[in-house]
Amino acid sequence: MRSFALLLLLSLLLPSSAPAEENGVRAFTPCRACHSLDPAERGLPGPNLSGVIGRAVGGVAEFDYSPVLRKARDEGLRWDAKRLEAFLADPAAMFPGLWMSMRGIEDVAERQALVRFLENTTSR
């Protein structure tokens, strides 16, 4: 009985990752109009985002990227959490001439939740 009470107490004290993941899923919802996390899905307006963290910018071979992203790829830029968060804040400022129409995510917490979500989907 004592060990059950201790486990119950610990479960209440430890932070849950469920709300954070829910925030990331919610933040990704508008992205689904153009992007997928299913590595097998092709033919969408935007590149597949499965495994985006650690991947070269403009790194999905069969996707037709804007010239600015092809240049970034040729320069060896890679997506990490910091670069992705800055990109999501203002994509066109980071890559002028970008074909993507998304203006950016103003809310810092929402951007961070989306980046964490993409990191977690990359590491699964």
Summary of predicted features, one role per range:
Residues 52, 56-59, 91-95:
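A short secondary-structure junction motif
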Residues 20-44, 49:
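Sequence/structural segment immediately N-terminal to covalent heme-attachment motifs in c-type
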Residues 4-15:
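Bacterial N-terminal signal peptides
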